[in-house]
């Protein structure tokens, strides 16, 4: 029984973390209809930034925020290459993904793996320390679930705003956005920034769970996240009360 519970716990821990990435890819793939391959580069970007900051003694929660911002900037670059320089969506993602290899190596000072064992992380500092001993062993599950829930709530709230509705429209009907005196290209850049920010945040959380960063960890992440979105939306497409972000998270689990 203990083995089964342990396996189930690990499934949900990984599922919650990758669910954050899946929600980000949902924005770019489903909402924006943009096949964003830069995800394979921004995921390890979040890991490398987090490992570098925690090794230097920075607050682990601050490392998560910085990772999100860095991922968003990478997403902006992908959008600018596509919107302003008229480079195709696939090639824009490939260029940024390739560039991230050099950026990540620069952050880790040339090391492919950057461990930070026995350092402070979001899983062993702050409010986690006051958890009762009986549930302390589930701290990773609890923290990862809370982080996922926060991202999901914020994303759901954003998609209900005027900017969020324009973001949806920019993917489905760019001409409508133009008729509203808005720039669909700018909305595309915003969408890619949000998507890659979530991806880098997921990388940041996973690196703190593993207490190390690996620049090769991004390989296949775009396939995994797309599979999560497709599986979730396909299985629960007829469930009207379920939000798309929830479907993406369930698909990741």
Language model regions located:
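Membrane-helix/interface signature in polytopic inner-membrane proteins
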Residues: 153-193
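Transmembrane alpha-helical segments in multi-pass inner-membrane proteins
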Residues: 199, 203-253
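Membrane-interfacial amphipathic/re-entrant helices at transmembrane-helix boundaries
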Residues: 1-21, 49, 56-62, 133-141, ...
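Membrane-interface helix caps of multi-pass small-molecule transporters
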Residues: 27, 52, 76, 80-85, ...
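Hydrophobic alpha-helical transmembrane segments
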Residues: 41, 61-69, 91, 141-146, ...
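Helix-loop interface residues and adjacent transmembrane-helix termini in multi-pass membrane transporters
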Residues: 31-34, 56-58, 84, 242
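Transmembrane helix-bundle core of multi-pass membrane transporters
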Residues: 89, 93-95, 100-160, 189-190, ...
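Alpha-helical transmembrane segments within multi-pass membrane transporters and channels
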Residues: 58-98, 148-152, 251-253
């Amino acid at each position: 029984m203990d083995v089964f519970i342990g396996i189930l716990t690990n499934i949900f821990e990984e599922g919650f973390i990758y669910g954050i990435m899946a929600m980000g890819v949902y924005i770019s793939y489903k909402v924006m209809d943009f096949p964003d391959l830069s995800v394979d580069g921004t995921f390890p970007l979040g890991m490398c930034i987090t490992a570098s900051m925690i090794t230097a003694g920075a607050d682990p929660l601050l490392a998560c925020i910085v990772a999100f911002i860095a991922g968003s900037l990478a997403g902006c670059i992908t959008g600018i290459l596509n919107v302003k320089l008229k480079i195709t969506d696939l090639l824009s993602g490939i260029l940024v993904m390739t560039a991230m290899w050099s950026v990540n190596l620069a952050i880790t000072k040339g090391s492919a793996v950057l461990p930070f064992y026995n350092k402070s992380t979001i899983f062993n500092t702050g409010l986690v320390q006051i958890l009762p001993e009986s549930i302390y062993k589930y701290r990773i599950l609890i923290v990862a679930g809370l982080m996922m829930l926060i991202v999901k709530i914020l994303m759901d709230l954003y998609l209900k705003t005027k900017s969020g509705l324009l973001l949806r429209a920019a993917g489905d009907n760019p001409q409508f956005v133009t008729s509203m005196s808005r720039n669909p290209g700018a909305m595309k850049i915003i969408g890619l920034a949000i998507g890659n920010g979530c991806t880098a945040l997921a990388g940041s959380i996973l690196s703190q769970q593993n207490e190390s960063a690996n620049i090769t960890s991004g390989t296949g992440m775009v396939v995994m996240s797309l599979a999560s979105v497709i599986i979730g939306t396909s299985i629960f497409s007829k469930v009207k009360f379920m939000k798309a972000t929830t479907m993406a998270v369930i698909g990741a689990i």
